[in-house]
Swiss-Prot record:
It is an enzyme of class 3 (hydrolase). GO terms for molecular function: cysteine-type carboxypeptidase activity; cysteine-type deubiquitinase activity; K11-linked polyubiquitin modification-dependent protein binding; K48-linked deubiquitinase activity; K48-linked polyubiquitin modification-dependent protein binding; K6-linked polyubiquitin modification-dependent protein binding; K63-linked polyubiquitin modification-dependent protein binding. It comes from Homo sapiens (Human). Hydrolase that can remove 'Lys-48'-linked conjugated ubiquitin from proteins. Binds to polyubiquitin chains of different linkage types, including 'Lys-6', 'Lys-11', 'Lys-29', 'Lys-33', 'Lys-48' and 'Lys-63'. May play a regulatory role at the level of protein turnover. The record marks D542, L545, A546, L549 as: Ubiquitin-binding. Residues 597-621 have a biased composition (Basic and acidic residues). InterPro entries: MINDY, MINDY_domain. Residues 507-559 are annotated as: Ubiquitin-binding domain (UBD). It catalyses: Thiol-dependent hydrolysis of ester, thioester, amide, peptide and isopeptide bonds formed by the C-terminal Gly of ubiquitin (a 76-residue protein attached to proteins as an intracellular targeting signal). The modification Phosphoserine is found at S94. One of its GO terms (cellular component) is nucleoplasm. This is Ubiquitin carboxyl-terminal hydrolase MINDY-2. Belongs to the MINDY deubiquitinase family. FAM63 subfamily.
Length: 621
């Protein structure tokens, strides 16, 4: 169906307005007749009733009140076979008529029933039923003509910007394809993009008119949708974690990494940092903080984009099952995964649903908790058990009557105790030889997931502690021993130079020195109070040991009481000296000479008294 610019009726504030008086063409009478007959012209209805302030300009292009459909009586009977006016025939074709429809608008067919309903009831957005045409009184020819021009569904939202939904289908935002982050949440503004408008032009009739000078009415709507998404995310994840972003120069590229504010497992950060360093996931420039939900959405987007294109039917079904399992445990990435290592290889784990995430993302997962194959008794005791199986074996062996099983349980328990750091030198050697040069992977140790890489034959762990957020020279930490005392390096794996003393905060350094001295004094005091067990003979009886302990306790008590008496004597001497000094200060200024002579006589007496008090307060040990 085609229409002229004069027949446009913007639905603003719920009232359909027609062209202004005096602006009608020579065929205005024909338009009024067809409006009265129920053959409404095609009009463009905005998606929002409020608009952006330009609706008044469009409202001024209105028909006289007598020509308005609201004022036209409903004429029952058959409708006109003419679908509308032809712009080419009427000579009213304008350059704007050939343009594509504006974003935020779609074409509807106005009928007298719709116009009358719009007068009494406020029309909502384009998705409301009030803005939809009532085709009950139209003929089959008009239904056919209007069917090719109707929008897809109420609201007009789709998960794809360039592929609008076909007519009659209702796209769902809850589908798997709409799993996007907050910055790319599909809104009506993105759905009605220029690319989508170009794709929709061939579907509509040529010469379709648009509002000249109109502006898309989707900015306010997009802000409202974003606010709704943020409110929904807060309800879904109350008290969610917020992470700070550190920007580094990684291979001459300004690359972000996610830092961790609390010490915990959080495999989500390790996985996202691998994807960020590989430039498979990109964040907005100079972004400083990000929420856990946003990280999950970025990860979900990447998992959907990484779906293989050409696979067989069996592989597709297997991939979909793995994707479903991964989505089910995706929320665990914020707190921790159930990873069960085996002590036979750096990439050998007991298969759990949590491992599917690493398989789908194609991120290697390593550990270094291996048994040295040269120690036969440990190899026999541990065998091919995983960590959980080994713990169960130790418990069962301890309760067994077989001495050999008890011995194996004891050896296995000793192995776990001696390798509490969950990294052995044999495992470190295997890691160094297995990890490829420049490979980005995840390293599991002590229930913690770290981003790891290999540079010139040396393993490095990414430093994600938030305390180093502003330290540009601290990016990687070398992994060259099992004690965890690696060296800090910058983004180019250069050792961190020592800090300039002038740049060190003096107050902070003084506090560190005081804390160190306090700890040292406490350590010395504790060592002085401890009993030297090496000096006690091995054959001593319990009675003699008790006597020695009692003597040590008596010595400590006497030392404590001596310190208390000395402190009390010093306090008494100080108070006496203060009382004697007050009369001397209260002497009149007129008798300065006599006062000075008296003070000179009193000074040796006071010194003698203090010496006598010190002698009396001394305790002979």
């Amino acid at each position: 169906m085609e229409s002229s610019p004069e027949s446009l009726q913007p639905l603003e504030h719920g009232v359909a307005a027609g062209p202004a008086s005096g602006t009608g063409s020579s065929q205005e009478g024909l338009q009024e007749t067809r409006l009265a007959a129920g053959d409404g012209p095609g009009v463009w209805a905005a998606e929002t009733s409020g608009g952006n302030g330009l609706g008044a300009a469009a409202a001024r292009r209105s028909l006289p009140d007598s020509a308005s459909p609201a004022g036209s009586p409903e004429v029952p009977g058959p409708c006109s076979s003419s679908a509308g006016l032809d712009l080419k025939d009427s000579g009213l074709e304008s350059p704007a008529a050939a343009e594509a429809p504006l974003r935020g608008q779609y074409k509807v067919t106005a009928s007298p029933e719709t116009a009358v309903a719009g007068v009494g009831h406020e029309l909502g957005t384009a998705g409301d039923a009030g803005a939809r045409p009532d085709l009950a009184g139209t003929c089959q020819a008009e239904l056919t003509a209007a069917g090719s021009e109707e929008p897809s569904s109420a609201g007009g939202l789709s998960s794809s910007c360039s592929d609008p939904s076909p007519p009659g289908e209702s796209p769902s935002l809850d589908s798997l394809e709409s799993f996007s982050n907050l910055h790319s949440f599909p809104s009506s503004c993105e759905f009605n993009s220029e690319e989508g408008a170009e794709n929709r032009v061939p579907e509509e009739e040529e010469g379709a008119a648009v509002l000249p000078g109109a502006v898309p009415l989707c900015k306010e709507e997009e802000g409202e949708e974003t606010a709704q998404v943020l409110a929904a995310s807060k309800e879904r994840f109350p008290g969610q974690s917020v992470y700070h972003i550190k920007w580094i120069q990684w291979k001459e590229e300004n690359t972000p990494i996610i830092t961790q504010n609390e010490n915990g497992p959080c495999p989500l950060l390790a996985i996202l940092n691998v994807l960020l360093l590989a430039w498979k996931v990109k964040l907005p420039p100079m972004m400083e903080i990000i929420t856990a939900e946003q990280l999950m959405e970025y990860l979900g987007d990447y998992m959907l984009d990484a779906k293989p294109k050409e696979i067989s039917e069996i592989q597709r079904l297997n991939y979909e099952q793995n994707m479903s399992d991964a989505m089910a445990i995706l929320h665990k990435l914020q707190t921790g995964l159930d990873v069960n290592v085996r002590f036979t290889g750096v990439r050998v784990f007991e298969y759990t649903p949590e491992c599917i995430v690493f398989d789908l993302l194609d991120i290697p997962l390593y550990h270094g908790w291996l048994v040295d194959p040269q120690i036969d008794d440990i190899v026999k005791a541990v065998g091919n058990c995983s960590y959980n199986q080994l713990v169960e074996k130790i418990i069962s062996c301890k309760q067994s009557d077989n001495s050999e099983l008890v011995s194996e349980g004891f050896v296995a328990e000793q192995f776990l105790n001696n390798t509490a750091t969950q990294l052995t030198y044999h495992g470190l050697c295997e890691l160094t030889s297995t990890v490829q040069e420049g490979e980005l992977c995840v390293f599991f140790r002590n229930n913690h997931f770290s981003t790891m890489t290999k540079y010139k034959g040396q393993l490095y762990l990414l430093v994600t502690d938030q305390g180093f957020l502003t330290e540009e020279k601290v990016v990687w930490e070398s992994l060259h021993n099992v004690d965890g005392d690696g060296n800090f390096c910058d983004s180019e794996f250069h050792l961190r130079p020592p800090s300039d003393p002038e740049t060190v905060y003096k107050g902070q350094q003084d506090q560190i020195d005081q804390d160190y001295l306090m700890a040292l004094s406490l350590q010395q005091e504790q060592q002085s109070q401890e009993i030297n067990w090496e000096q006690i003979p091995e054959g001593i009886s319990d009675l003699e040991l008790a006597k020695k302990l009692q003597e040590e306790e008596d010595r400590r008590a006497s030392q404590y009481y001596q310190e208390q008496e000395q402190a009390a004597a010093a306090a008494a001497a100080a108070s006496t000296q203060a009382q004697q000094g007050q009369p001397a200060q209260a002497s009149p200024s007129s008798g300065r000479q006599s006062g000075n002579s008296e003070r000179k006589r009193k000074e040796p007496r006071e010194k003698d008294k203090e010496k006598e008090k010190e002698k009396n307060s001394c305790v002979i040990l």
